[in-house]
């Protein structure tokens, strides 16, 4: 049986479908800059969080953060066209679970730098949830990137000190699980304005946080701290509400609605790099060689995850052109 020989130029279409599928997982350059800006703010925010819990109770700060996220923005942005149950799930996952646990953890149970590291387990949790719930596929280069990043995180994790407790690590892991769960809810909220989505979801964050603060921290303690609240702490809370929450989570959810979770979530692995850099610059934290080495591994992982599809596609196209030239000769 004689097989048809492809015409010259047809080989360019071989594997084109798979290449296009791979490129769907690659962020455009403007979107890359947006998400880098978001993770940079998140990283530096760990320093602000630590400064805040040194002045106010952690659950009280969390409630105030999301209260100022909700008000006054909720009066100016329309409700997103998404089910109330989706907003409920996102609001509880991000507001209560992630940040409720995270603020408690950085209040003397774990250092800000290590917290910025451990919470990145949300990347693995997000990808695992995507595989199970959405049947998303992970490419070989994405898996390799995760392994590199895990090595970098392991190096940092092996250099803990007496300022970190198992309870702090456990609470931060629960926070990471809350973040990953929030990623799943925002992933399902396709075609909505993510700014309004983030704002309206805090309707379900504030009430439980206020109740938890009243129960665990007490009305008298809350009243005493509010009476002595200074303008620096107040501005810090506003920044966490408007900059870190509305701006950054709006970007994060907006990109998750357009790209696979396996492409967006690994960018959060840069948060410890920004967090440690901000801590070194603002708090005088030292940066020994092991921290620099770990940061390099994380950056290498991000480069592989970001440019892996482009590199593979370029290699395939080059191989196809070489075969065409060989057949032509």
Feature map (PLM): residue ranges:
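Specific alpha-helical transmembrane segments that line the substrate/conduction pathway
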Residues: 60-70, 103-146, 175, 261-280
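Hydrophobic/aromatic residues within transmembrane alpha-helices
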Residues: 52, 61, 105, 132-134, ...
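Hydrophobic transmembrane alpha-helices of multi-pass small-molecule transport proteins
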Residues: 67, 73, 128-129, 138-158, ...
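Transmembrane alpha-helices of multi-pass small-molecule transport proteins
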Residues: 2-7, 11-15, 41, 51-97, ...
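Hydrophobic alpha-helical transmembrane segments of multi-pass membrane transport proteins
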Residues: 36-44, 48, 88-109, 128-129, ...
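Transmembrane alpha-helical segments that form core, pore/gating elements
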Residues: 47, 70-73, 126-127, 132, ...
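C-terminal-most transmembrane helix of multi-pass membrane proteins
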Residues: 2-24, 28, 33, 62-66, ...
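Membrane-interface helix-cap regions at the ends of transmembrane helices
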Residues: 48-51, 55, 68-83, 150-164, ...
């Amino acid at each position: 049986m004689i097989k048809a020989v492809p015409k010259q130029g047809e080989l360019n279409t071989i594997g084109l479908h798979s290449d296009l599928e791979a490129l769907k997982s690659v962020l455009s350059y403007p979107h890359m800059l947006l998400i880098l800006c978001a993770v940079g703010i998140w990283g530096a925010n760990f320093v602000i969080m630590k400064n805040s819990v040194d002045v106010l109770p952690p659950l009280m700060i969390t409630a105030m953060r999301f209260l100022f996220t909700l008000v006054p923005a909720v009066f100016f942005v329309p409700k997103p066209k998404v089910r109330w149950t989706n907003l409920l799930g996102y609001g509880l996952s991000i507001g209560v679970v992630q940040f409720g646990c995270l603020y408690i953890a950085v209040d003397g149970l774990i250092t800000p730098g290590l917290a910025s590291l451990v919470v990145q387990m949300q990347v693995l949790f997000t990808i695992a949830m995507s595989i199970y719930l959405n049947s998303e596929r992970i490419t070989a280069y994405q898996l390799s990137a995760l392994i590199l990043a895990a090595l970098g995180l392991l190096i940092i994790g092996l250099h803990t000190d007496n300022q970190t407790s198992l309870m702090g690590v456990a609470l931060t892991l629960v926070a990471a699980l809350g973040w990953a769960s929030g990623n799943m809810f925002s992933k399902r909220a396709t075609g909505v304005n993510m700014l309004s989505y983030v704002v309206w979801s805090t309707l379900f964050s504030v009430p439980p946080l206020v109740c938890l603060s009243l129960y665990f921290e007490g009305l008298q303690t809350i009243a005493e701290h509010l009476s002595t609240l200074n303008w620096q702490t107040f501005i810090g809370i506003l920044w966490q509400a408007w900059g870190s929450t509305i701006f950054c989570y709006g970007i994060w959810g907006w990109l998750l609605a357009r790209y696979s979770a396996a492409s967006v979530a690994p960018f959060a692995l840069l948060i410890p790099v920004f967090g440690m850099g901000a801590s070194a610059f603002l708090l005088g934290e030292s940066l020994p060689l092991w921290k620099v080495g770990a940061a390099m591994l994380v950056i290498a992982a991000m480069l592989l995850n970001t440019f892996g599809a482009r590199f593979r596609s370029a290699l395939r196209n080059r191989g196809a052109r070489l075969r065409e030239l060989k057949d032509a000769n």
